[in-house]
Swiss-Prot record:
GO terms for molecular function: ATP binding; serine-tRNA ligase activity. This is Serine--tRNA ligase. It is found in: Cytoplasm. Belongs to the class-II aminoacyl-tRNA synthetase family. Type-1 seryl-tRNA synthetase subfamily.
Length: 454
């Protein structure tokens, strides 16, 4: 089976046009591709005819009398020159066609919503009881369980920097720029514990722990993401053919670059830990305070290489895995189905898992889970040999395990007390227990005496 987008363009171009319109992408790409592809097919046919004629002349020349051989040889040379010229044209057309094919987003699953302007996702399910003030009750989704709080919660930025005094974005801004931070004391241990918790829980489910390269060559990075869209969002190393990864997904996807797999080698499950480097160029002035949206953070990532027929099962599975991690922390959340226009080019379907932030009175994204089908594997040349020696592109999937700094912000807003003390989720305590200097049950503001609460 060929690449699904290429196959759809040839067999049902109108369906691809509908996908592009749903994604709010220029649908004229279809016509440009079909024109190139038609010319390519025409020239391929011409090459076959020229080769046939050339072979015919060669056979004829071998049997011809000496007086005709020179004439036949001259015709053969002319044909060979023409063949070489057409083959060069085909190579150039293939380059142009491949470049154009790279600009196509993935096809979309039938369950992906096509949404009106101003709507980016559709809620699928909710979990947990949210803390909300009377003034914010109207902002809740229908059917969400809630408890009304009298005191307005403190936002995560003020909790970290003012109440706990364990983060400093002002000094980081002075020495590094906006969206950088210093993290201190118990929040450092919390960062480590969150990563260990996610890595451990997922490894127990059969995911292989991996720390991928933190930098990738241009030829690889352009294959794992939509480079034209994200080239201004990722960091390039000056003077080097290297880019800093925005997520462990990129390095893990590249691990099987140009691999031919057997059916029994799939699925392959990985849980990666890495720092993530992002320019956040499109964020503007959003979330400038605190550590919610920053240039570098640590993240645990699930990644799956799957047989094509099993990828939708795995999409639900990895989403449930992350839900279990968030439920284990006791954070109220919802799962939303992302609208077609907001999917991003690689994903055929994407769920976001959004956690409730009491001080903001809204859900904020904590994790994304995507089925990328064969969009990455086509670019990376990762195929599986099926029975009968048929080759297909594998499917790849990715899902956030936990992004540590963002999860810290959710913990600070959801588990704060009136006296500024923050309760540590019970699921994290086993990962803090072996570390003598780490907090065990509570994080106390630096200004108060650290005595267990009554």
């Amino acid at each position: 089976m060929s690449y699904s987008v290429l196959e759809a363009l040839r067999k049902s171009p109108e369906e691809v046009r509908k996908v592009l319109l749903a994604r709010r992408v220029d649908a004229s790409l279809v016509d440009k591709f079909l024109a190139l592809d038609a010319k390519w097919r025409q020239l391929k046919k011409e090459i076959d005819e020229l080769r046939h004629l050339y072979n015919q002349l060669s056979r004829e020349g071998a049997k011809a009398p000496p007086e005709r051989r020179r004439e036949i040889s001259e015709k053969a040379r002319e044909l060979a020159a023409k063949l070489e010229k057409v083959e060069e044209e085909v190579k150039e057309l293939e380059r142009q066609r491949e470049e154009l094919l790279y600009s196509f987003p993935n096809l979309i699953h039938e369950s992906v919503p096509v949404c009106p302007e101003g709507v980016d996702s559709v809620p699928v399910r909710h979990w947990g009881t949210v803390k909300v003030s009377n003034a914010a009750l109207q902002s809740l989704d229908p059917g969400v369980e809630y408890v009304v709080v009298e005191k307005e919660p403190v936002g995560h930025a003020d909790m970290a920097e003012v109440v706990l005094q364990m983060a400093d974005t002002l000094k980081a801004g002075e020495v590094a720029g906006s969206r950088f931070y210093y993290l201190f004391d118990d929040l450092v241990w919390l960062d480590f514990a969150l990563a260990m918790y996610a890595m451990d829980q997922l490894a127990q489910k059969g995911f292989r722990p991996v720390i991928p390269p933190y930098m990738l060559k241009f030829d690889i990075i352009r294959r794992v993401l939509d480079f034209d869209t994200f080239k201004d969002a990722i960091y390039k190393i000056e003077g080097e053919d290297l880019y800093l990864i925005a997520t462990a997904e990129h390095g893990i996807a590249a691990y099987l670059y140009k691999r031919e797999l057997l059916e029994e080698e799939l699925p392959q499950l990985y849980v990666g830990w890495s720092p993530c480097f992002r320019k956040e160029a499109g964020a503007g002035n959003r979330d400038l305070k605190g550590i919610f949206r920053v240039h570098i953070f640590h993240k645990v990532e699930q990644f799956v290489f799957s047989l094509p027929e099993e990828s939708w099962k795995w999409h639900e599975e990895i989403t449930r895995n992350t839900e279990e991690l968030i439920r284990g922390l006791g954070l109220p959340y919802r799962v939303v189905n992302i609208c077609a226009h907001d999917l991003g080019a690689p994903a055929a379907k994407k769920y976001d898992i959004e956690v409730w932030y009491p001080a903001q009175a809204k859900y904020r994204e904590l994790a994304s889970c995507s089925n990328v089908t064969d969009w990455q594997s086509y670019r990376l040349g990762i195929r599986v040999t099926r029975k009968g020696m048929k080759k297909e592109y594998v499917h790849t999937l990715n899902c956030t395990g936990l992004a540590t700094t963002r999860t810290i912000t959710a913990i600070l807003e959801n588990f704060q007390r009136d006296d500024g003390v923050v309760e540590i989720p019970k699921a994290l305590r086993p990962y803090l227990e072996p570390i003598k200097a780490a907090p065990k049950e509570y994080i106390y503001p630096r200004r108060i005496k650290q005595q267990p609460p009554s």
